[in-house]
């Protein structure tokens, strides 16, 4: 059994949670997230609803992780990016 080191990351607008965990080399993304204890630290993570990725590439929870991976838990969008740009440009035009 080999032990690897990965980081699990969850970012909010005002704070980032970064947990480094040591897990078995046969572990999955789900195993790493559970080992990080972020689900208990940050209450608004909806484990099975949020998308996850490794270095900005979407992956499934059952994907195997490698040493040095950065597992990212993504937040749901609050507002559509196109709508936000539209609102911002309207504000700038009014000034």
From Swiss-Prot:
It comes from the Bacteria. InterPro entries: Mopterin_synth/thiamin_S_b (IPR016155), RnfH (IPR005346), RnfH_sf (IPR037021). SUPFAM superfamilies: MoaD/ThiS. It holds the Pfam family Ub-RnfH. Coiled coil: none annotated. Belongs to the UPF0125 (RnfH) family. This is UPF0125 protein BUsg_244.
């Amino acid at each position: 059994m080999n032990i690897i080191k990965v980081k699990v990351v969850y970012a909010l607008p005002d704070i980032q949670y970064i947990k480094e965990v040591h897990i078995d080399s046969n572990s999955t993304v789900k195993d790493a997230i559970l080992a990080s204890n972020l689900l208990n630290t940050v209450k608004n993570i909806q484990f099975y609803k949020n998308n996850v990725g490794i270095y900005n590439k979407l992956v499934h929870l059952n994907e195997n992780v490698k040493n040095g991976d950065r597992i990212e838990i993504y937040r749901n969008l609050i507002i559509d990016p196109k709508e936000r740009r539209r609102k911002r440009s309207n504000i700038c035009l009014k000034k």
